[in-house]
Amino acid sequence: MANVTLFDQTGKEAGQVVLSDAVFGIEPNESVVFDVIISQRASLRQGTHAVKNRSAVSGGGRKPWRQKGTGRARQGSIRSPQWRGGGVVFGPTPRSYGYKLPQKVRRLALKSVYSEKVAENKFVAVDALSFTAPKTAEFAKVLAALSIDSKVLVILEEGNEFAALSARNLPNVKVATATTASVLDIANSDKLLVTQAAISKIEEVLA
């Protein structure tokens, strides 16, 4: 079991928190992490590319000239692909680039990135992040007290709306919950700021 220092909002030590080795103490599997990150980045692609084929291009309903007797090549529409302004053949159509990996693979990737952050001392545990109202300045003070000045992913428990609203407008700060934090977000962050309640939820889901 790994022990990490537990801080309060003012940056003072509030004890120790014991992390489950099954979630935060495994040997990171870089291959699985890579596969999951590629999958999540693929899902972020918009895939809205499109062109018009001959049925979608405006016009071209009338045969441009009669079939025989003109000496010209036969044509059925001025929107055929060989015409300037005609439809595109086999062009791109809107599609989703996303694909799903097995749940076991996704969970192993999450455990791997969490374990890596703990091993690199980039995991900051805080007893709670409680605010009486959404105040960005107050959250900035919390980060300063905890000496966090780089890219950070804040992982909260469900329902902590004021903390989420206080943090989301700060530069280099991203907010997630224990159940929505992604492998991509965790790997992209320099530090993790995790509440004690969120740690319990992460262990409940992944252990």
Curated annotation (Swiss-Prot):
Q: Which UniProt keywords apply?
A: Antibiotic resistance, Ribonucleoprotein, Ribosomal protein, RNA-binding, rRNA-binding
| Disordered: annotated segments | 49-78
Q: InterPro entries per the record?
A: Ribosomal_uL4 (IPR002136), Ribosomal_uL4-like (IPR013005), Ribosomal_uL4_dom_sf (IPR023574)
GO BP terms: response to antibiotic; translation
- SUPFAM superfamilies linked to this entry: Ribosomal protein L4
* Molecular-function GO term, any one: rRNA binding
Q: Does the keyword field hold rRNA-binding? A: yes
Among its keywords, does the record have Ubl conjugation? no
Q: Which GO terms describe its cellular component?
A: ribonucleoprotein complex; ribosome
Q: What does this protein do?
A: One of the primary rRNA binding proteins, this protein initially binds near the 5'-end of the 23S rRNA. It is important during the early stages of 50S assembly. It makes multiple contacts with different domains of the 23S rRNA in the assembled 50S subunit and ribosome.
Q: Describe, as the record does, how this protein assembles with itself and its partners.
A: Part of the 50S ribosomal subunit.
The UniProt entry's sequence similarity note says: Belongs to the universal ribosomal protein uL4 family.
Protein name in UniProt:
Large ribosomal subunit protein uL4
Could you tell me the gene encoding this protein? rplD
